[in-house]
Amino acid sequence: MVTEIKSLKQLGELFASNNKVIIDFWAEWCGPCKITGPEFAKAASEVSTVAFAKVNVDEQTDIAAAYKITSLPTIVLFEKGQEKHRAIGFMPKAKIVQLVSQ
């Protein structure tokens, strides 16, 4: 399951209740985001030990600014609320699963 993040408060609650969180920062107009989104969802269905979330940067500009998102798609892995890995551009399901399994 992929959770759509709609506020900084919701994001904080997600961090508080999950050890590992991976977030796909995306936008409707972003071509590579349209390819990455389904891959991200497939990875989420395979890995139950990590919280998967998406942030639409056009709707949640405060979150995008807080995490300095300047390119799309950007996938960020957090452990205990701290950024551990950041990847920019298309990422296939296998790479996402590999990343969260480390």
From Swiss-Prot:
- Disulfide pairings: C30-C33
Domain of life from the UniProt record: Bacteria
Q: Please provide one cellular component term from the Gene Ontology annotations of this protein.
A: cytoplasm
Gene3D superfamilies per the record?
Answer: Glutaredoxin
| Record family assignment | Belongs to the thioredoxin family.
Q: What InterPro entries does the database record attribute to this sequence?
A: Thioredoxin, Thioredoxin-like_sf, Thioredoxin_CS, Thioredoxin_domain
| Domain (Thioredoxin): residue spans on this chain | 2-102
Query: What GO molecular-function term can you cite, just one?
Result: protein-disulfide reductase activity
* Described purpose of this protein according to its UniProt entry: Participates in various redox reactions through the reversible oxidation of its active center dithiol to a disulfide and catalyzes dithiol-disulfide exchange reactions.
By what name is this protein known?
Thioredoxin
Q: Which organism is it from?
A: Mycoplasma pneumoniae (strain ATCC 29342 / M129 / Subtype 1)
Keyword Disulfide bond part of the UniProt annotation: yes
| Keywords recorded for this protein, A-Z | Disulfide bond, Electron transport, Redox-active center, Transport
Q: Which PANTHER family match?
A: GEO12009P1
